[in-house]
Amino acid sequence: MQLTNPNRDRKAVVIFSGGQDSTTCLFQAIQDYGVENVEVVTFQYGQRHAIELEKAKWIAQDLGVKQTLIDTSVIKAITQNALMDEQARIEQHGSTPNTFVDGRNALFLLYTAIYAKGQGIQDIITGVCETDFSGYPDCRDVFIKSMNVTLNLAMDYQFHLKTPLMYLTKAQTWQLADELGVLDYIRQHTHTCYMGVEQGCGECPSCVLREKGLREYLSSKSEAEIDV
């Protein structure tokens, strides 16, 4: 994997949870910008799967990128959802799962933009995805584009919000990881489970989507190899 940036005048910050999607984005950013030009921002917001914070810290250190941890746990006092309530059952409520955290991605993008401007960084990368967005309205492309305009106007600064996974299925995200040469790394070191089970519970929506995508990708890869 290329670790030097052909455009050394640009830097990027990745919104980083230590999960499959954001770690894939981080590896792509390292390839595109160079490891010396990439930082990550991680958020502690009272998530029940706090093990992701440990994973994020370990991965950032392992890859040699600067990590900034931002505490936004105040959100836990003003909204309720199954992602922050350890006693709540994870289930679907209408078209939106009860794991949806109102305002989370808007808050993450705002805080990251504030940090990025202070560092002279314009490119902000987030792993949100519309194809497998699970009913989360703040994972849609229309939201990201709207937020990009809002942040630019609010801070009189030219941010570029980048969403490399926006139109990829989970299987295609696994394919991207494989193309980057980090499929096994993503499988072994990232955390996705909403329940906070280190190797995954295999039952929550996030685990199901991750495993389904992996099976689909490995199956299609195997078929392609047979056809060659």
Curated annotation (Swiss-Prot):
Signal peptide: none
Enzyme Commission identifier(s): 6.3.4.20
Gene Ontology biological process terms from the UniProt entry: queuosine biosynthetic process
GO terms for MF: ATP binding; ligase activity, forming carbon-nitrogen bonds; zinc ion binding
Cofactor: Zn(2+)
SUPFAM superfamilies per the UniProt record, alphabetical: Adenine nucleotide alpha hydrolases-like (SSF52402)
Keyword check for Metal-binding: yes
Keywords assigned by UniProt, alphabetized: ATP-binding, Ligase, Metal-binding, Nucleotide-binding, Queuosine biosynthesis, Zinc
Record-listed Zn(2+) binding positions: C193, C201, C204, C207
InterPro entries in the cross-refs: QueC (IPR018317), Rossmann-like_a/b/a_fold (IPR014729)
Pfam family for this entry, one: QueC
Job description of the protein: Catalyzes the ATP-dependent conversion of 7-carboxy-7-deazaguanine (CDG) to 7-cyano-7-deazaguanine (preQ(0)).
Full protein name: 7-cyano-7-deazaguanine synthase
